Structure formats: C-alpha cells, structure tokens
Amino acid sequence: MIDRKLIFDPGKNQVIQTESGERYYFSLDERGGDGAVWDARSDDDDVDVTVDHTYPPTEASVRIRVHRGFDGPSTVYFVRKKPGSSEIVRKFTMSFFKRTGNVAVWE
C-alpha cells in the first residue's frame, strides 16, 4: 500500500524520513502579482517530482514519488522564478532519507 502524506509546511527547508513507494502531495502559493512560478528538480533518479500550475498563476500542485528500491539520501530543490528571468524569488529544499530505526541527520 502506498503511504500518501501531506507536507504541512512547504516553502521551508525540510528533512523527511521516507520509504520506497511513498508519495507526497502539497501546494505552493504562486500569488503575488509578479508572475513568478515554482519549479523543482531532484538530484536522484529514485525520486520523481512533478509541478503543475494553475493559470493565471495562483497555485502550484506538487507531487513527489519515492521509487521502490530508494536507499537515500536524496534532495529535491525548489526555486521560484519570474518567467524568462534567472532571478530567484524564493527557494527551499526537501532532503529525503531512508527510514530506519535511527534518526537521520542531514549535515
């Protein structure tokens, strides 16, 4: 069974303990009048991230899927940029660790 979780505080750097097959869903606010939108990328093939936008930009829906066989750690990088610009308006990361009996710490 897939464990679906909602990340309650998106927009801040977070450390998450996870297992293979887990999925995470949350929304990011894109209101603000500047037209800036969120984008995300993962540094690991074992973690997929998808960002869907509403039009006009008011909200980004984020889905993260941890593949079977995930052994961590992995980080997803989020950046909010204005269209056609390299200027970063806001950014944060989500670091994923394989869940074990021990607490994982990101240094």
Residue spans of the language-model regions?
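Aromatic sugar-binding surface patches on proteins
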Residues: 56-63
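Outer-membrane beta-barrel proteins
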Residues: 14-16, 52, 66
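Short, solvent-exposed loop/linker segments at beta-strand-coil boundaries, enriched for Pro/Gly
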Residues: 32-54
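Glycine-centered tight-turn and secondary-structure capping sites
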Residues: 67-76
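Beta-strand-rich extracellular modules
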Residues: 79-83
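N-terminal edge beta-strand
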Residues: 1-26, 31, 101-107
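Short beta-strand/loop motifs in extracellular/secreted proteins, especially
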Residues: 24, 34-38, 74
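C-terminal edge beta-strand
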Residues: 86-106
